[in-house]
Design a protein with these regions (language model features):
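Hydrophobic helical membrane-anchoring modules
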Residues: 1-10, 15-36, 181-186, 208-275
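Cell-envelope/extracellular polymer assembly enzymes that use nucleotide-activated donors
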Residues: 38-40, 69
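Acidic helix N-cap motif at the loop->helix transition within catalytic regions
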Residues: 50-54, 79-88
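Short, acidic, metal-binding catalytic loop of nucleotide-sugar glycosyltransferases
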Residues: 57-67
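Conserved donor nucleotide-binding strand/loop of the catalytic core
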Residues: 69, 83-117
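A conserved acidic beta->alpha catalytic loop
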Residues: 74-83, 103, 130
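Acceptor/aglycone-binding surface of glycosyltransferases and processive sugar-polymer synthases
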Residues: 101-117, 122, 134-213, 238-248, ...
Length: 275
């Protein structure tokens, strides 16, 4: 894979069960129907009630330049995030869909569930905690329109970076990124980014395990010929709520790396036997 490469990721559904609830038919000014979305923004949520209003506000502003829809995938948040999302969907200035799942089933499977409800041909994945700037959405979309299959908001290319992280978290991130790149033979600089855009058909095909909280690395590992663009951005640590990252998520990520590595070795062996 080369930088600015493009690709073809394919997916299963490790989707958790969920019931999508769309907002009433959205209309623009003067009562005109809104244009069909060209970009679907999938946002997994769990206890993000405090962040949600600012997220919707930021996406509404971005939707002035780009026809967006927002798909919230809520894992039965005890703080009422899903209920608040339903209420906001009734008057949101952009199309808004809320998918309710019965419990925590992981961020990766939430993204797959959201992609299944998307109406546009391009899906963007971002956090609900305001760490991912909505103003970068046009650049990600333009990269896909320009021929990329995957467009990554990258912390580890020139002009990218991370703000407000303690040294220990920076170290963990770098070690995990290096493990993914070296272990799976990935050439992109930030295969663990949680902020990326991808062609919808890539996420709705079968085959993904949907384990843990990092779906992008599985996309890249399964589709080494993917055409990928990396767009620099600075990750600003979340300003609302608490981090989703847990020891369980880290363990799921390590299991995923091992599973993907074994899968690549098996594919290589099968290829050699056929020669």
């Amino acid at each position: 894979m080369k930088n600015r490469e493009r690709g073809n990721p394919h997916a299963d559904s490790g989707r958790g069960a969920g019931t999508p609830t769309p907002a009433p038919r959205a209309r623009g000014g003067a009562g005109e129907p809104r244009p069909a979305p060209v970009l679907s923004v999938v946002v997994p949520t769990y206890n993000e009630r405090d962040s949600l209003p600012q997220l919707v506000s930021g996406l509404a502003e971005a939707s002035q330049a780009l026809a967006l829809e927002l798909i919230i995938v809520d894992d039965a948040s005890p703080d009422g995030t899903g209920t608040l999302a339903e209420e906001m969907a009734k008057s949101a200035p952009l199309r808004m869909v809320v998918i309710h799942r019965p419990g925590k089933a992981g961020l990766a499977s939430a993204v797959l569930a959201g992609a299944g409800a998307a109406q546009s041909g391009v899906v963007t994945v971002m956090d609900s905690d305001l760490s991912h700037p909505p103003e970068l959405l046009p650049a990600l979309f333009e990269a896909i329109q320009g021929g990329a299959d995957v467009a990554i908001a990258s912390r580890y290319v020139p002009r990218g970076g991370v703000d407000q992280w303690p040294w220990a978290r920076r170290l963990v991130s770098r070690v995990a990124t290096t493990a993914a790149r070296v272990g799976l033979g990935l050439r992109v600089r930030d295969p663990l980014s949680g902020f990326f855009a991808v062609r919808r058909e890539i996420l709705t095909e079968r085959g993904y395990r949907g384990l843990g909280y990092k779906l992008l690395v599985e996309i890249l590992a399964r589709h080494p010929q993917a055409r990928v663009a990396e767009i620099p951005y600075r990750f600003v640590d979340r300003r609302q709520g608490r981090s989703k990252l847990s020891y369980g998520e880290i363990w799921a990520f390590l299991r995923l790396l091992v599973t993907l590595k074994v899968g690549k070795l098996e594919s290589w062996r099968v290829g050699k036997l056929k020669m």
